[in-house]
Amino acid sequence: MTKPRTQLIFLWNYVEWGGAQIFLLAIMKAARADWDILVVLPRGSMPTILYFLDDLGIRYEFLDVAIQVSEAPGLIDKIRRQWRRIYAEAVSLKYLMRFDLKNSILHIETAPWQSWLLLTALAMRRAHVFVTMHNFMPRSSKLREMLWRLRLKFVSGLPGFHIIPSNQDTKDKLSGWVRDDFWEKMIVAHTAIDPTEIDAALESEFVRSETRMRHGIDPDNFIVLCVGQFIDRKGRWVFLDAAKQVIDKDPDVAFVWLTPKLPDEAENARIVEYGLGNSLNIVLSDSVGKAREDVLRFFRVADVFTLPSYVEGLPIALLEAMALNIPSISTRVYAIPEAIKDMETGILINAGDSEGLADSILRLKRDPELREKLARNGRKFVLENFDERVVAGKVIDSYKRSLEGK
């Protein structure tokens, strides 16, 4: 008789998708042959992530609740957001009670220093819980940081609980915030790329001028691309400020931002103030195609990739751009220097430095030999160090050890 497959449940409580979901999809790809996989996500989730799940043949179910991930500007908004998070976690816990958690793996996207009550309740059910941390917590008041430290010390002592840092920077910074024995056992499972998808995107038929024109991009311009959510922590206004500086000096440069969600009315009003006109195109990722290969192929419209983030782990979009042979510029924050070695595999600038970003873009435009060097070295470094098949194997091994009580 065939042994039933072990249940592997992935859960997140927000409708947006990004690098965190790409990280989990890599694990699903590697695990789907041997595990019974279920994804639990909010109703109303962006269609692209559902397409990715369908493409992999992954079963999913919806919860009728979602948290707010955008910034809460006022005190009342912050209180509402916290209450919504607590309510969403209560709904999630009630849903999860139908499963044999003692003999399953639960991999959830949550902040363990906030969701300690949920994690405690799951530990009482003898669940095997894994949480990915893509970056260390943002700096806050001494009182709040003390509270976070106490909570992390507590949850790191819960049986069956695991944190998987997706980069070395996050693990290093967690030292002293979690129990020492817990920290020693944490494995780093880097954000990573799928080399087969990268090669497929590079080898597939692609006419750059036609793709550019199809999305309103001048086919003859030097294109600077950013990919990710159009939000503050990704450095969106730094990107636009640098764009204005560059275009004032060289009007043959244009800027493109590929995003899963277009700006709202207030954001568009602020964008207009930069006066970039046709030199800026914000493109909805759904419009370039539904498959991962479609998104990766779109990267090839770019001459240079940049991600001027303030807060970031090890961003998948940056690794993908580098693997696709695109010279890349990003910020020396969190784990980004684990991929970009300044002037060797890319260019590093300080977060918030729009002038530095503009200068780096112009330098690359004027120096094709430097572009070729950074593109070649960047691709080689990513392919050698950030292969998702290796990373997924490490995570799945951790699942198995947890079930074995190790």
Which residue ranges define each predicted feature?
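Conserved acidic donor-binding segment of nucleotide-sugar-dependent glycosyltransferases
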Residues: 342-343, 347-354, 363-368
